Regions:
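Conserved C-terminal helix/tail region of periplasmic/extracytoplasmic solute-binding proteins
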Residues: 295-331
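Short, glycine-/small- and polar/acidic-enriched structural segments
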Residues: 26-166, 170-176, 180-186, 196-203, ...
Length: 331
């Protein structure tokens, strides 16, 4: 009997080891959405590309939906459990009865610039001419209105806003003269070869940071209630991804290039630089920016009421900060 004890002991240890390995390797399948290939959404695809979701126990399928309004519809329908959405889209859906909640925002401002025809040199030149956006309530819509106001003009009244579609459609409408300009993320102008243009104003020109819940992990209230730990792991992955992006410039530029399918050095440099400094270390949901979006959404819906607490719950982020998780990531 003594001869077999070591063997049995070894087998027991092996079985325990295999069981622990199986538990450690167990990955929860989840669909996660991102809404743009530009650098502002890099926190999402960097987390996927470098395995931060996997590190936090998620077998993630990253799905590209190039519109906040469409993405919001997918989250509401339950097709996407957690995804990126901006505060404007969430507020607009919420006043319509949707049970949506932003649980954390990596980017709480809107890094956009207003690209216009080269002949437009002043706000007065822009008056009466149309600006193109993707859809009402989208980030491009919010950016267009903020930039127009920044010029001292009134959106719609002084400068008509047209829904023309995504970035390719806006570029086509601009080239064809249907619109006089369009709001654009930083760096895109470097790709506008053959299109005479200028940047008339940028949110970076504003005297005060433009508060806006832009890149926000969003889900439904029922999903958050039933799968709080899953949402927590998504946020942990995004926090780790944000840290990597802010501290690994050249590697991050390559990832932007991979997802945007661009190799233009000036574009990669400008887009990375603009976004890296704006990503928040602690991804809380800006109250000031959210309340502005609530005000605008409520104004478009008769008898609608909405509060910050109705569409924002960053309690998980606060828990992660209090636990020391974020400090540990940034050591």
């Amino acid at each position: 009997m003594k001869t077999y004890r070591p063997v049995f002991g070894t087998i027991a240890i092996l079985m325990i080891s295999l069981a622990l390995t199986a538990q450690g390797d167990a990955q929860e399948k989840i669909k996660i959405e991102y809404s743009s290939v530009d650098a502002s959404n890099a926190v999402w695809y960097t987390a996927q590309d470098l395995g931060f979701f996997k590190k936090n126990g998620l077998d993630s399928q990253l799905i590209f939906i190039p519109s906040t309004t469409t993405a919001v519809s997918s989250i509401i329908a339950g097709d996407i459990p957690v995804g990126n959405a901006s505060g404007g889209g969430v507020a607009s859906a919420a006043v319509g009865g949707a049970s949506l909640v932003m649980v954390g925002c990596a980017l709480n401002t809107l890094p956009y610039e207003l690209v216009v025809q080269q002949s437009i040199k002043s706000p007065e030149d822009l008056k009466g001419k149309s600006i193109g956006i993707s859809r009402v309530g989208s980030a491009s819509d919010v950016a267009a209105r903020a930039l127009i106001k920044g010029l001292g003009l009134e959106p719609v009244k002084d400068v008509p806003i047209l829904q023309v579609g995504g970035a390719p459609e806006r570029a086509s409408a601009f080239r064809g003269g249907r619109i006089a300009g369009f709001p654009s993320p930083p760096g895109i102008i470097q790709l506008a070869q053959g299109m005479p243009h200028r940047v008339l104003i940028s949110t970076a020109d504003f005297h005060k940071r433009f508060e806006f819940p832009y890149i926000c992990a969003t889900t439904t209230k029922p999903y958050l209630s039933a799968h709080r730990d899953t949402v927590k792991r998504v946020l942990m992955a995004l926090i780790e991804s944000t840290h990597y992006f802010k501290t690994h410039k050249e590697e991050s530029k390559k990832i932007i290039g991979k997802y945007s399918r661009q190799s233009n050095p000036a574009y990669l440099e400008d887009s990375y630089t603009a976004v890296a400094k704006l990503y928040d270390r602690v991804p809380l949901v800006t109250r000031e920016g959210t309340e502005v979006q609530i005000k605008e959404a409520v104004a478009r819906k008769t008898n609608a009421t909405l509060r910050y607490e109705d569409i924002a719950d960053d309690s998980i982020v606060r828990e992660l900060e209090k636990s020391g998780f974020i400090d540990k990531v940034y050591k």
